[in-house]
Amino acid sequence: MASLRDIRKRIRSVKNTRQITKAMKMVSAAKLRKAQDGILAARPYATMLDQIIADLSARAGDESLSHPLLTARPVKRVELVLLTSDRGLAGGFNSNVIRRANRFLYENTNLESIRLSTVGRKGNDFFRNRGQNIRKDFGGLYQRLNYRAAADVAEELVASYLNGEVDAVHIVYNEFVTAISQTVKVAQLLPLQTLGTPDQASTAGSTSLVDFKYEPDRQSVLDRLVPQAVNIKLYRALLESVASEHGARMSAMENATSNATDMIGNLTLTYNRTRQAVITKELMEIVSGAEALK
């Protein structure tokens, strides 16, 4: 049986751990709110871009509108961009998305090549430790995450696509649903997939369909907007991943705090029982000694 001193040390240790997990939960909750604000701010812009591009494509009429980032070609070489976190203690956040990336690699072994790029230290460490060749690790992106930083990454991926190095670019990430729920998603970044028709784009957004007039011409507008649509799509995926990370960590730390509280209760009960047993034993020894002196 553990001594009272050992049990007290364990209680003190668990209490210290509970303080840490509680603080981490509060920090993650604050960061989650900020990440959610970013998602909400980007959503109307992204939806309107999709609507305009779909409108341009659907209302082209006799015009020959095209853009290389909208044109699909036979897929032989693919780049997979994996979004994980830099830190752990986030439940199944990283393991789920890494498992999905592994499945993507396994399901597409018929391709000529699959290049892997990573955002986040956890995914990079996992695949490097297993001998997987990583084309590029966009390290430190989360520390400076904004639209411009995401656009820099997107422009590098676009250059690879336009140069013919890859025929498609996919991103695998955690899509934010709620603070306690995230969905692993594989999304095609290039060639860009629009919502198809202007009616579909309008239905997906909050704005009603507008018959736009484009100046100076449709092709010029399309050339300007398509790269921006790629940028915002990657930026939204990064924001979704960040929000999912903080939601998963907040949930994990809440569970850890709850478990620590339960453990403290059990240890306190054990401590009291052990203390009672020690006192009872001492009383019995005193009584026995007194009886022996009679």
Swiss-Prot record:
GO molecular function, one term: ATP binding
One of the record's GO cellular component terms: plasma membrane
GO biological process assignments: proton motive force-driven plasma membrane ATP synthesis
Pfam families: ATP-synt (PF00231)
Membrane topology type: Peripheral membrane protein
Subcellular location per the Swiss-Prot or TrEMBL entry: Cell inner membrane
Major location category of this protein: membrane
Swiss-Prot/TrEMBL keywords: ATP synthesis, Cell inner membrane, Cell membrane, CF(1), Hydrogen ion transport, Ion transport, Membrane, Transport
Record HAMAP family: ATP_synth_gamma_bact
Family note: Belongs to the ATPase gamma chain family.
Self-association and partners: F-type ATPases have 2 components, CF(1) - the catalytic core - and CF(0) - the membrane proton channel. CF(1) has five subunits: alpha(3), beta(3), gamma(1), delta(1), epsilon(1). CF(0) has three main subunits: a, b and c.
Its job: Produces ATP from ADP in the presence of a proton gradient across the membrane. The gamma chain is believed to be important in regulating ATPase activity and the flow of protons through the CF(0) complex.
Name this protein carries in UniProt: ATP synthase gamma chain
Organism: Myxococcus xanthus (strain DK1622)
